[in-house]
Regions:
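Periplasmic/cell-envelope proteins involved in peptidoglycan metabolism and beta-lactam response
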Residues: 1-293, 315, 398-408, 450, ...
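Beta-lactam-recognizing serine transpeptidase/beta-lactamase-like catalytic domain environment
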Residues: 68, 216-221, 225-229, 269-321, ...
Length: 616
């Protein structure tokens, strides 16, 4: 007779056994297949995956002079699982010259996932960066006594010259946000922080390699796994060639010593930046090594803001350099002809409004107005343009046309230079004034914008680009610091011509005015050079002392260099702007300074401006 109770019990026992087996299978599958910790642990028992860092790309000036290169460095890495309970902490600390408290603090920070998001007990973690040669030699001899610790070879940046800090930038350790944004990086990695080191990070950094090492049961390295068949060699970063002429850059930094301001020089033939000086500056060689963080904090807290690249971040009234853009607009729109003459009896005076000007013959026509930097002429031009209802219908529509010309010349928006932090400046529009004056305004209300004052603000780069556009008689290339990336064509952003709305005929008259200025006008100091220079001064009004501004290019035909100089509180454009611009152009065109120019450069270097406040 069948015992159904026994049979039923057998089914239950069998079912329980099957469930237990299934649970074990699932757990084993989870451990071996799904568990990341298990995989890392299993790997670490037999293998050591050692990251090999690529050589970061070198940086050269336009003449092939090495500006930035690499030096070998050594980081100390730790695998927590391997050192637990096996490390003689006192011996370890003595070998590195650190305290036990510092050791314990560092180990806690490594384990803190809020500070080290990529932490794992089974993979290498950064313990100490940039061991000195002495510490490396000592540690290498004793490394067998410190299980779980390894030396990782890499490189650090070295800067050949004390120049071009704002252009080159620097390299520092990655932040948490850097790691979150790009999984290429791990804690302790380096990344470009400023300048072209930041903008061209992906080109410069290269690709990491991996070396898989085989270990025995005690964790001792036995050699490469499968003779290195699975290793991945690092790929070096790409070298960059700049448009910068390091000798021209050095001269510019020398000339701006003791002054706040900027110099930007551009080759108008291709838009490459020949020099970019921002003063005050700093020595890029001091932002390397273990003291980088301390030095960077000091610079960032300095009230004179030496980290600020005024060439692309400073937004200033352009003063009379802006008159060239007005001449181009009035001529092309038919508001004036080259022979149109306006009165200027020490300024523009109409309906109780007066804008002052220095003494010169009156009435005056276009070329002489540019040469002598007449305020009245350009005020009259804007007044007639914005007041021409028969042509535009309203002041708002006329203002929109005016702004379209300004935008086509590269104002009011970022030009797109290959450096981080560029500012756009300010070009007002009709909506701006409608809001400010509740729709009740006219050409007299905004007359100061015609002479580069009022609401108009440009960066020194935009002023230089205006000069390059005039040098080219109507077009510009987006200014760029890098001329060549190793193995890659230059981005088409930097090789396309950008034409303005102004006519070529208008540009020819503006060039004539700038040449006249260099011969007999406000830039006549340039007449001593044996190359045909063209220039335009600016004296930008300011709440304190006026700013000294200059924009020019040379030679007049087939120009090779365009330059903008901006010296805060420097007074007349001829006081600082013209002499600085002149010697810079001579240095680039001739390759050296004449004795007379060297004497002038020495005098300019020695001149200091007493700034009344340390807050800039």
């Amino acid at each position: 007779m069948v015992d159904y109770k026994l049979e039923k019990r057998s089914y239950v026992i069998g079912g329980v056994a099957i469930v237990i087996v299934i649970v074990y299978i699932i757990r084993l599958f989870t451990l071996q297949i799904m568990s990341e910790d298990y995989k890392k642990n299993a790997d670490s028992n037999a293998f050591l995956k050692q990251i090999e860092f690529p050589s970061r790309g070198a940086i050269y000036d336009r003449n092939g002079k090495l500006m930035v290169y690499n030096q070998p460095s050594y980081d100390l890495m730790v695998v927590m699982k391997e050192q637990e309970g096996r490390l003689d902490t006192l011996d370890f600390c003595n070998s590195l010259g650190i305290t036990k408290e510092a050791f314990e603090k560092r180990m806690e920070d490594i384990k803190d996932r809020s500070k080290n998001p990529g932490y794992s007990r089974y993979t290498q973690q950064l313990f100490m960066t940039q061991l000195s040669d002495k510490d490396f030699s000592v540690f290498q001899e004793k490394m067998f006594r410190f299980p779980g610790f390894y030396v990782q070879k890499r490189s650090v940046r070295e800067y050949t010259y004390p120049y071009a800090a704002h252009v080159l930038g620097d390299v520092g350790e990655v932040s948490e946000s850097d790691i979150e944004e790009d999984d290429y990086y791990q804690p302790g990695d380096y990344i470009g922080k400023l300048g072209i080191e930041k903008h061209y990070e992906k080109e410069l950094r290269g690709v990491k390699g991996v070396k898989i090492l085989l270990r025995d049961a005690r964790g001792r390295i036995q050699g490469s796994y499968q003779n290195g068949k699975l290793d991945q060699r690092p790929v070096a970063g790409k070298d960059l060639t700049l448009g910068i002429d390091v000798n021209l850059q050095a001269l510019g930094e020398r000339l701006l010593q003791g002054k706040i301001g900027s110099i930007v020089a551009i080759d108008p033939r291709d838009g490459s930046v020949l020099a970019m000086v921002s003063s005050p500056s700093y020595d890029p060689r001091k932002l390397v090594g273990k003291n980088r963080g301390k030095m960077h904090r000091w610079l960032s807290q300095n009230p004179w803001k030496p980290l600020l690249n005024r060439s692309i971040m400073g937004q200033y009234p352009p003063g009379s350099t802006f008159k060239t853009s007005q001449a181009l607009t009035y001529l092309t729109e038919g508001i004036i002809t080259p022979g149109t003459a306006f009165p200027c009896n020490h300024g523009f005076s109409y309906k109780g409004l007066h804008v002052g000007c220095h003494g010169h013959p009156s009435p005056i026509a276009l070329v002489d107005a540019i040469s002598t930097s007449c305020n009245g002429y350009f005020c009259w031009g804007l007044y007639y343009m914005l007041g021409s209802k028969s042509k535009y219908g309203s002041v708002q529509k006329a203002m929109t046309v005016w702004k379209d010309y300004m935008v086509s010349m590269g104002f009011g928006y970022k030009l797109g230079i290959d450096l981080p932090g560029e500012k756009r400046g300010l070009i007002p529009n009709a909506q701006f004034y409608d809001k400010a004056y509740k729709g009740s305004w006219n050409g007299l209300t905004v007359i100061s914008i015609s002479i580069g004052q009022g609401e108009v603000n440009l960066t020194p780069l935009q002023i230089a680009n205006l000069g390059a556009t005039i040098a080219n008689r109507g077009y510009y290339y987006v200014p760029h610091v890098v001329r060549k990336v190793q193995g890659e064509p230059l981005d088409t952003l930097y090789t396309r011509r950008h034409y303005t709305k102004a006519s070529k005929r208008a540009y020819n008259y503006v060039v004539a005015g700038m040449r006249s200025s260099a011969l007999r006008g406000t830039c006549k100091m340039l007449s001593r050079y044996d190359f045909e220079a063209c220039g335009k001064t600016g004296t930008a009004q300011n709440r304190g002392h006026d700013h000294s501004v200059f924009m020019g290019f040379a030679p007049m035909n087939n120009p090779k260099i365009d330059i903008a100089v901006y010296v805060e509180n420097g007074g007349w454009g001829a006081d600082y702007g013209v002499p600085i611009g002149g010697v810079m152009m001579e240095q680039y065109l001739k390759g050296k300074l004449s004795p007379a120019s060297e004497s002038q450069a020495a005098q300019m270097q020695a001149r200091r401006i007493a700034y009344g406040s340390s807050s800039r």
